[in-house]
Amino acid sequence: MGQRASSHVTETTTSRWTFTDRDALIAFFNARALRQLSAVEQWAFHQNIGKNIEPTEELDLQALATLYGVPADVPWFTEVFYTFVCRLTSFPLMNDCSPPTYMGLLKVCLLFNKKRAARYTARKSYDVASLVLALLAPPRDACDENVDQFDGDKLIDTLDGTFIAELEVPAIKVLRLFTFLLQILQCCDGSNTTLSPSMFADWEQYEQISLCLLRSLDSTIVSRSDARSRSITYQQFAGGLRSVFPNVFDALGLFLERLFYVKRDTTNKLLYTPTKETSTIVTNLLLTQLSTLYPRINLFTSMQRLFVAGDAGFSMSVFQAKVFKWMAPTILFVSGTRIQDDEIVCTKNKRYKAFLQDYPALKDAEQQLALCDRKKRNLIYAIFVRDPWKITNKDLFGDMDTTIIQLAPRQKIFKAQEAPNIYFNAVGGGIGFGSSQPSVKPAGKRYFPGNVSFTVDPSMEFAVFRNVGDGGMFSHGSAVPAPAEQPLSYEHRLMIKDLEVWGYGGEEELQKQIQRWQWEEAEATKRKYIKTNGGNEDRALLEMAGIVGHYQSGGSV
């Protein structure tokens, strides 16, 4: 009966894939999975798993680790990746408890690639968030073997009867998932990249970044131990994937499709290289976290160090000299320690006391910090600026792409809602995002922080991030459904440890900037070596313009 039912299946989105028994259903989707591969991919798949091994044979943990070059004892490998293979072996019966097979691994490769998943399931789109949460959740009771009919379409659409809206997954599993995804985000340059087990030895460092992502879903999670007693809902996970870390799955398909390349066609070239420039903020780990939001190829290959306050000095004028010639987008990074007690700091630091007189701090009743913010003092912010920097002592600059990003202790995204939205005040006002210009007068100074704003004082010693809700130039935060006790307003006042600006952009922007620098250097050289023979009109014109002469070397204008 099962064979007769499957022989009449048509593969269109309007057809019904119905089967009279479980084995016929699984056999059909196994055969369909193999048909998704080209002849070359099928050959490579069989070469990798072993010429004499059938795809339906059992796959143990060590064999899977060998296939992908990952140590079998890494927690995310055993608790996440191997679980995916186990649960998808009998797809679309995801609650079936059959032993994992190589066919299950092939289905993982197909279902985590958008195009392949759409063809395999005959759906225009496939919700990765739903699939991941369903796989991480404990399996429910499998289908009754005595049912009269297995409906393949219904099993796919409902993920084998999973109530997605009611899903709750242990937070520790989501933490393992993020650690897995972050490690391959940094490592995988392409789908034919060969990875070494030694690359995954420092997975604990990635777990610390993963905690920042996890806290964006649940701000009551402070440490790994908290994750063992918390759960993440589908609404939280889907909201985070939509607006906090939209690129977190970008490298998963590349990692999985290593299976479709034979050894001679693979490369050990990695996406990242060890950071050459000295930086206390911008490390490969931080770039990996930032690549959950921005294209990772630009972050790992096209970042240009422009200004590091720890080396060049905490100075607005040095910032201006180092950054203002860069005509492509930039990212400003600020790291610091949250000031917990203003009174104690004021007694030790008179400059901070003066700053508080200029900057109207929130009242205690309005200061409602989340638990993870209260427990974690180290803060990191990144601000993406597309417009070239310029001095604006009266007006503002910055377009709708300006984005304030909190990276630690949790990741939150604050997008521009109005433009312009930035000032660089060179007469004592400092740097501000989301605020109107401060009032700087001989009698005193006054800041006017916006509802969602980030302010750096002119000495680059203190910074303040304020979030009191809607109504400002920036959104109030990422669109993750929050529990009822979520703080409505808060302010982070921090003592700056370091401040850096890095040029950002694709290869085209980088080449244009290099060409501009080369042109400016050539022009400066021409001016410097103009002959000073009597009657030289060029020299006279340049002296009149104040470009050369009077002890000036003739640098770029």
Swiss-Prot record:
- Keyword set includes Transmembrane helix: no
UniProt entry tagged with the keyword Mitochondrion? no
User: Which keywords does the record carry?
Assistant: Cytoplasm
Function in brief: May be involved in a process influencing telomere capping.
Please state what the protein is called.
Restriction of telomere capping protein 5
Q: One GO BP annotation here?
A: response to oxidative stress
Q: Which family does it belong to?
A: Belongs to the RTC5 family.
Q: Name one GO cellular component term.
A: fungal-type vacuole membrane
TLDc domain residues are 280-505
- The set of disulfide-linked cysteines is none
Cellular location of this protein? Cytoplasm
